[in-house]
Curated annotation (Swiss-Prot), chains A, B:
Keywords: FAD, Flavoprotein, Oxidoreductase. The keyword Acetylation does not apply. The keyword Acetylation does not apply. It holds the Pfam family Pyr_redox_2. One of its GO terms (biological process) is aerobic electron transport chain. PANTHER family: 64 KDA MITOCHONDRIAL NADH DEHYDROGENASE (EUROFUNG), APOPTOSIS-INDUCING FACTOR 1. Belongs to the NADH dehydrogenase family. Binds 1 FAD per subunit. This is NADH dehydrogenase-like protein YumB. Its EC number is 1.6.-.-. GO terms for molecular function: NAD(P)H dehydrogenase (quinone) activity. Its cofactor is FAD.
Length: 406, 406
């Protein structure tokens, strides 16, 4: 047994990090390297399902699983701790409760909400980010409904939910809300007509980048289910009372709301920025082999990274799909770095994108085919199950998968 | 058919009011009188189960049923409205959306929390009173737990629950909390040891009036399940930060808590007071036939009334048990008033009192026998089912009853 085995440290047990770890043991033998995975919690959560946990349509426990259940515990050290800093020069990771030395580092810390400096959003708006924020938002909405009937003077702002952003996350969350609000009305004896769901989007269209036919379908479905859209309208400020929004060159409007949700953007994890990597909004533009430029022993993947599409000369949008595929490449390349061989270039294989509209509806493109309604919703669940399958195999898929197809 | 049938109006569909209405049709024929029942909601709720709904151990929908399902709709007019005032001189009831003229009036509006003028309790403490307050308290507690892990600086006051009052309601609520807190800890990833449940009671003992052996049993059980008791200690003030409490002649103590529950007393409904009846804390000391002194056409029952125990020369404590028994007497006496006959005197038949300590434990006295543990818990459920049976018969009991005996 080698005494000085190289140390591989993987930060984050998200889609990218966990995929790396589960594949790594194929390419790196027990005598080749020590493997350590660091994650804040002892569980992995499905970031792509957080709109459901946030609305309360899917319990958060259905959206997470124990990390120890999917890693090879005899090969991988799991450290439950919070990464505080990465010291590149000292090859060291500072944790809340200790430090780790590495020879090879994989960064998969994911994203954090981006508020673009809009006043008050950080303080008063709810992000859709992880298990903690999802439980908070779900409970906050429930408390607003629960409070409504206990007050002598009725407050419509308790029943007004503003969603900032009509991109992927915003639309998926609105889809869940449209299903959840009638349930909340029943649970708390509130008339549905008193509840307002307002989506505010600065861009001139909903779901930018999506096929216009699918966009129309989604907007129509959501409007039919009580969502009001304010398109081409920017959130200018968030306060404890609500939001100020406005169209260009028009008088701003105040919307009173106790529940402002910010779903209009994410950026890379600040720790990556603070570590000194060159970055754009916290994302490091990685080399084709997924290493950070100038750092031959550091791989960065998923939402912490930025990968260019050679054809369009624009970066790929950060998705779980890409993060997982990158995990496979990182695992392979770590094997080659340690045991020799040429590093592989990452080649994304975009199978499609489907945005859910509640449990039974969706829009998207899969293998180049436009889908909407039941077929799209079916595919969405197949995709959701696929992440489980790729990381945890059939057992995990059966345990946590979505099988209520129709 | 008589053109000028007398009008009977019953206010409140609680234990007393609903019992009156369901029995009244036995003593008063369709040609004898018009019967109108007024209640704020279209449902009756089990006030005696509100500690469960408030803690979240029993869903509030399990604690209520539709009024129309238990009244004879061909005989009883049901008006869903809020009573705003009673004008005795004009024989008129003012509702939020109208007025009702009566010849005979039955008042069963129940109780409201009594804060004894303690500063801040009205504003910042949670009562355990009805479906609305229960949902609010349940959701408030959940939100505190949900928030805890989302804050960088951990706030113990989110996990500190103070219950003011170790009487019947306080102890029953503590019993539910003891069961609920471990569930909340699991749901929100909070360590049980971080949660504090503190009971503050000004009187020198827990459950005043109960047998000391049963009191010891209850205190021991609750302490074992993590409840801290501060006995002989008064709540002096409630603020948004928590409570100030103190023993006589000692330095007061500040307890930081986001959840202060006030379970230390109720008083009669203010509408009864405002109507001009002579009263003590909103309760009218009624004649033996349950009429208000000086008002031959007005019956008052349940928590709105005060009925003297001739033996002890003290009033009976207000209970659902008595309210229901009074309903039977009121129905009979209304029949006699209208059709002739001497009015009956109300004779309470106290079968016992059982305080639950969560779902599987309780203490109490039934037919003079002391009970604790499983037998007491069994009897508690029998009593809970009995109210359903008396008002709605077997059908309602099977639908809403508590049958998980062990
Ligand atoms: C509501 C929503 C819906 C989405 N839908 C889709 C979709 O349908 N399809 C799709 O492909 N993509 C979707 N995305 C995008 C997708 O979720 C992300 O691109 C993906 O999660 C990125 O994976 P990752 O491995 O980089 O990070 P993540 O999967 O987010 O994981 C990051 C991990 O790092 C951990 N971590 C963070 N900070 C620290 C720290 N300081 N110390 C220790 N551990 C830390 C976290 O706990 C987490 O486990 C969606 C996103 C959202 C929010
Ligand atoms: C947590 C708890 C546990 C208890 N446990 C027990 C127990 O184990 N055994 C026991 O015997 N007693 C118990 N009690 C006491 C018991 O609940 C009361 O004594 C009983 O509810 C009194 O019945 P009531 O008919 O007077 O009023 P309630 O049953 O309280 O009904 C009053 C009704 O009036 C309606 N109302 C109020 N205001 C208006 C308005 N302005 N307009 C129209 N309608 C209105 C309400 O909606 C309600 O339907 C408990 C009380 C609590 C809070």
């Amino acid at each position: 047994m080698a005494l000085n085995k190289p140390k591989i440290v993987i930060l984050g047990a998200g889609y990218g990090g966990l995929m790396t770890v589960t594949r790594l043991t194929k390419y790196v033998g027990p005598n080749d390297a020590d493997i350590t995975l660091v994650n804040k919690h002892n569980y992995h959560y499905e970031t792509t399902w957080m709109h459901e946990a946030s609305a309360g349509t899917l319990h958060h426990d259905r959206c997470r699983y124990q990390i120890k259940d999917v890693i090879n515990q005899s090969r991988v050290n799991f450290v439950q701790d919070t990464v505080k800093a990465i010291k590149i020069d000292e090859k060291k990771v500072v944790l809340a409760n200790g430090e780790l030395q590495y020879d090879y580092l994989v960064i998969g810390l994911g994203a954090v909400p981006e508020t673009f400096g809009i006043k008050g959003l950080k303080e008063y708006a709810f992000p859709i980010a992880n298990i903690n924020t999802s439980r908070l938002l779900r409970e906050h909405i429930e408390l607003q409904f629960a409070t409504y009937n206990t007050e002598a003077e009725k407050r419509p702002d308790r029943l007004t939910i503003v969603v900032g952003g009509a991109g992927f996350t915003g639309i998926e969350f609105l889809g869940e809300l449209a299903a959840r609000v009638p349930e909340l009305c029943k649970e708390y004896d509130v008339d549905r007509s008193l509840v307002r769901i307002i989506c505010v989007e600065a861009a001139p269209t909903v779901l930018p980048g999506f096929d216009p036919e699918l966009v129309d379908y989604a907007v129509h479905y959501l409007e039919e289910n009580g969502v009001e859209f304010k398109i081409g309208t920017a959130v200018q400020e968030c306060t404890p009372e609500g939001v100020r929004v406005g169209k260009k060159d028009e008088e701003p409007e105040q919307i009173k709301s106790q529940t402002v949700v910010w779903a209009a953007g994410v950026r890379g994890h600040p720790i990556v920025e603070e570590a000194g990597f060159e970055n754009m909004r916290g994302r490091v533009k990685v080399n084709p082999d997924l290493r950070a430029p100038g750092h031959d022993n550091v791989f960065i993947l998923g939402d912490s990274s930025l990968f260019m599409n050679e054809d369009t000369e624009r970066p790929y949008p950060p998705t779980a799909q890409i993060a997982m595929q990158q995990g496979i490449t990182v695992a392979k390349n770590l094997g080659r770095l340690i045991k020799g061989g040429e590093l592989e270039e990452f080649k994304p294989d975009i199978k499609g994108t489907v945005a859910s509209l509640g449990e039974h509806n969706a829009v998207g493109v899969v293998y180049g085919r436009k889908l909407k309604g039941t077929p799209a919703s079916f595919m969405k669940k197949v995709i959701d199950n696929r992440s489980l399958f790729m990381i945890g195999g059939l057992g995990l898929t059966l345990k946590k998968g979505k099988f209520k197809f129709f």
